[in-house]
Amino acid sequence: MGFQDQRSKEAFARANGVLPGGVNSPVRAFKSVGREPIFIAKGQGARLWDIDGNSYLDYVLSWGPLILGHAHPVVVGAIKAAAERGTSYGAPTEIETECAEEVIKAFPSMEMVRMVSSGTEATMSALRLARGVTGRNKIIKFEGCYHGHGDSLLIKAGSGALTFGVPTSPGVPSSVASQTIVAQYNDLEGLKEIFKECGEDIAAVILEPVTGNMGVVLPQPGFLAGLRTLTQDYGSLLIFDEVMTGFRVSYGGAQGRYQIDPDLTCLGKVIGGGLPVAAYGGKRKYMEQVAPSGPIYQAGTLSGNPLAMAAGLATLKLLQQEGVYEGLEKKTTRLAEGLQSIAQELGFPIWVNSVGAMFSAFFTDQPVIDFKSACSSDVERFGSFFRGMLERGIYLAPSQYEAVFLSAAHTDADIDYTLEQARDVLKSLG
């Protein structure tokens, strides 16, 4: 039986009656790839099954958290054992401390950690902390970098060299947007000009050290080190949003891979083992300013939830096994380079950026080093590629500007099959 999606279509129609756009997060609606979404029934290992019975090799992995694959038996066992003792206490537990200790071992720049429930919560809290400890209001973010849906982060670049932000969403006050300056990723000289203009007012610079939300874009040599020096010179905090890259591009994240220590770090995704967990942390002198030890407030009913801590701790312990990251990177590189090779052979313009266990294939003929070059991608052609791959049992992110993720559960045979299907789809696109 070939690809079927009637039940998913019916489920989406039903969902549209009670959920805005039929989904609980916009990209899940598949709008940018020209079709309706599939509805998932279950996941196991590297595979997903939808409610129509179609099976897929999954390269989305819940947008990155499932680095061990779906329903890993050790992680599931940890969740079950925790649930039998209670699902939430709203009180301290030993496992919170144990999780924090494991995170700190992996990220030496983090001397203290606060657990929260989402990446958005982590970045919002880190920015509040940066403003609180510096006494400054302005922040710098980079065009194309996504840090959650906090008001001060839903900002795009305005016009001119000193690009004070403008809101990208109704409901974000212009007074909030005006406190955010939007810079260009990998443009260190442009950043220097911004700091010359208003460096004494800048509380923090926040960025994905490797971007994942305009697709995977790698830092150019010297960019992160120059940014570290620049922020130190002006007394501004450097915040790495490693929600996506933490425990994925290496066990110690992008900062471990590139040997750059930020002042504050935001984590999420992998540290929850598939459950809602995030964290922010950094140097003790800053984190001690967070309530109740300091005056900068942050709280959460489900922060440090015992089920999430159990899943996260089990995941981190498994990731510490010898050879895990070497295997992940080897498979990722093989898939990324294989796709690039097939595209070149067939005369398709595709640019691939790959690092650790994530990569992006941009449908463009130019190097992708920033937001502008990422936007040169042919999104319609990507949409056609996505649909063709989906119908052949390959589940990619439904957006040109998202990453491909691999897990420890993906096999060489999975990669072979994926490349075979990619060749067929690209041939069909002419």
Curated annotation (Swiss-Prot):
UniProt-annotated location(s): Cytoplasm
Cofactor(s) for this UniProt protein: pyridoxal 5'-phosphate
A biological-process GO annotation: protoporphyrinogen IX biosynthetic process
Enzyme Commission no: 5.4.3.8
Pathway the protein takes part in: Porphyrin-containing compound metabolism; protoporphyrin-IX biosynthesis; 5-aminolevulinate from L-glutamyl-tRNA(Glu): step 2/2
Keywords: Cytoplasm, Isomerase, Porphyrin biosynthesis, Pyridoxal phosphate
Gene Ontology molecular functions: glutamate-1-semialdehyde 2,1-aminomutase activity; pyridoxal phosphate binding; transaminase activity
Primary location group: cytoplasm
Highest taxon, organism lineage: Bacteria
A GO cellular-component term linked to this record: cytoplasm
Catalytic activity: (S)-4-amino-5-oxopentanoate = 5-aminolevulinate
Residues where N6-(pyridoxal phosphate)lysine is found: K269
Subunit (UniProt): Homodimer.
Homology family: Belongs to the class-III pyridoxal-phosphate-dependent aminotransferase family. HemL subfamily.
Protein name per UniProt: Glutamate-1-semialdehyde 2,1-aminomutase
The species this protein was found in: Desulfitobacterium hafniense (strain Y51)
Organism lineage: Bacteria, Bacillati, Bacillota, Clostridia, Eubacteriales
Gene coding for it: hemL
